């Protein structure tokens, strides 16, 4: 297959949650390795307002990959993950479309694909990395909540990682492919 970011395509797309654990234990040069899943073509609904959005499932350590400026509330935490809580962090554009300026969205419920999620935070980050769509247009769920809501099983779309200081990402890729 064709290479994608230095990974063979087939291998990249069929990563499972168990692969993450294996990479964590075997590739010592990796500082943070965190999976993410995403879906496009959803709508975030609050009261009578709607906004086209993407939905992402992330872990708390994603903050080490792309830091989030929280204008309100907080990011996903370990308890959200463990309990697969129906909570979400909304992006800036979603906030601007659904809420009044200056309104605190935390504690309010936003409906996405028929499920209500309590807003725990609003990230004002534009998301310069653009991993799986813009942060400003995403509803972010705890990874485990997203797995359940969309029946994803152990499927992972993208693995994000950072190398320890002094290690080149290009040096890591062959190790991670094994």
Label every PLM stretch briefly.
Residues 1-54, 61-64, 96-97, 147-148, ...:
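Hydrophobic, regular-secondary-structure patches
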Residues 54-56, 60-80, 84-178:
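Mid-to-C-terminal secondary-structure elements
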